[in-house]
């Protein structure tokens, strides 16, 4: 029987998370969550269990900023990079979860890289 979309998503998420844990070496994690309408990103210190910076399209000024949600995702990427710099964070690793690196996720990652985050 074929796998459902949800099963494939969960498999991808586990595969990505395990690869990231193996190569983490104490670095911070830029975790991304996408829904059909919004996207959010958090810089998480897994060693201490603390979120150091966060940005979301639910915030005032970061929502629907252009013709589509890809532009809003890029705005969230720029915001998280700016907040990371303010907190003194330059390097992290990108945790896309089970989401494909395409569209909104790619736009957020590219904008965060342009903003100065290295991953």
Curated annotation (Swiss-Prot):
Pfam families: Ribosomal_L18p (PF00861). One of its GO terms (biological process) is translation. InterPro entries: Ribosomal_uL18_bac-type, Ribosomal_uL18_bac/euk. One of its GO terms (cellular component) is cytosolic large ribosomal subunit. Keywords: Ribonucleoprotein, Ribosomal protein, RNA-binding, rRNA-binding. GO terms for molecular function: 5S rRNA binding; structural constituent of ribosome. The keyword tRNA processing does not apply. Signal peptide: none annotated. Belongs to the universal ribosomal protein uL18 family. Part of the 50S ribosomal subunit; part of the 5S rRNA/L5/L18/L25 subcomplex. Contacts the 5S and 23S rRNAs. NCBIfam families: L18_bact. This is one of the proteins that bind and probably mediate the attachment of the 5S RNA into the large ribosomal subunit, where it forms part of the central protuberance. This is Large ribosomal subunit protein uL18. It comes from Cereibacter sphaeroides (strain ATCC 17023 / DSM 158 / JCM 6121 / CCUG 31486 / LMG 2827 / NBRC 12203 / NCIMB 8253 / ATH 2.4.1.) (Rhodobacter sphaeroides).
